[in-house]
Curated annotation (Swiss-Prot):
Its EC number is 3.2.1.18. The active site is at D150 (proton donor/acceptor), Y405 (nucleophile). Homotetramer. Ca(2+) binds at D293, G297, D324. Its main location: virion. It comes from the Viruses. One of its GO terms (biological process) is viral budding from plasma membrane. This is Neuraminidase. Keywords: Calcium, Disulfide bond, Glycoprotein, Glycosidase, Host cell membrane, Host membrane, Hydrolase, Membrane, Metal-binding, Signal-anchor, Transmembrane, Transmembrane helix, Virion. Glycans are attached at N32, N47, N56, N57, N67, N68, N87, N145, N200, N234, N401. The lineage of its organism: Viruses, Riboviria, Orthornavirae, Negarnaviricota, Polyploviricotina. Substrate binds at R117, R151, E276, E277, R292, R371.
Amino acid sequence: MNPNQKLFALSGVAIALSVLNLLIGISNVGLNVSLHLKGAGTKQEENLTCTTITQNNTTVVENTYVNNTTIITKEPEFRAPSYLLLNKSLCNVEGWVVVAKDNAIRFGESEQIIVTREPYVSCDPSGCKMYALHQGTTIRNKHSNGTIHDRTAFRGLISTHLGTPPTVSNSDFICVGWSSTSCHDGIGRMTICVQGNNDNATATVYYNRRLTTTIKTWARNILRTQESECVCHNGTCAVVMTDGSASSQAYTKVMYFHKGLVIKEEPLKGSAKHIEECSCYGHNQKITCVCRDNWQGANRPIIEIDMTTLEHTSRYVCTGVLTDTSRPGDKPSGDCSNPITGSPGAPGVKGFGFLNGDNTWLGRTISPRSRSGFEMLKIPNAGTDPNSKIVERQEIVDNNNWSGYSGSFIDYWDDGNECYNPCFYVELIRGRPEEAKYVWWTSNSLIALCGSPFPVGSGSFPDGAQIQYFS
């Protein structure tokens, strides 16, 4: 074959390949157009799937090399909001790791940090936030004098990104009040704030930031609620509220809400003698609340709510390992039905536990007399066995540093787990009354921890502020 014939042959092959490449490109364009027309012709209001087609055509005539690549990728489906269903069990936990620490008091030495107390954590489909009751002032403001008082007209609920100390510029105002709870049902958030006079208080209920109803005091003695997140199942949210004496008989109700409206309420049933400041978590279509008996018990009362029947019962954590503060020494055997008394006893502190059979964990201050230090105790079957004992201990805050309230929370929208990973927070109170020598204010920082399925190391995570810097 002479050179001219070779040239014609190569040119013919190149032209053929180019035509083939052109036909493939035309077919890809046709496919793309047909897919888009099909998507446009079908109206889907909830679940939409986007298809992206990337075409790369390369032709080199001289070397007769053709590269034709078509990549079809599916973007993740958009899921319409739906009600949370408590259809998982709690995850097993081998130890606890810190996931957030806001260092609010340390920042407050030079920054305009808001004075708060009663903080907690609550999650929704987009993530988790810190909620707290502010005192209408910043730490360095002269109005911080006297913020040891729990109930004033200047308090209100705010939220910030978890781990971010609250300032005037980054805090989101929620509602006015000196007691609160908040939870997300998967579609919207319900929030309750209690405001007004001690003997004539009102609870205001909001759903998606809009006022939906109000609840007036029923015992005229400091109507109050959980000071941590409530929990929802299939659109119904359960909240524990108490009205009455903090040191004798009080009147507790379990209330059920749908979109911020009361659909049912039950007076306290079961053997618990006094209920305050419940820390609640959901699992297996149930809600378990570990609460505070401010009247008699150094053991914690619990409320168990069946969210399929909207009914509850109450009793006490069975173990003889006592977790309220103040408390007497641990007992060889506990009591599932009655408060365990002893000196020192009342008044108490908000606390929590995760009652999960062999993987039960309870939290408590290290000091039996004051709100200092914090530890997590693994006590298998503590919720059901009076003779259950501590098998593992993890220190969270050493006993040379102040702690405070603590409570539970769970990110129910963590799709990476086939179970609900337990989490909790600890309030780190600074100022009065323990540090009245240095300052006139009372405020807090916060740490949040979540369970690890693997063994963890050790560490103490105190507030860390040098209080004398504020003198």
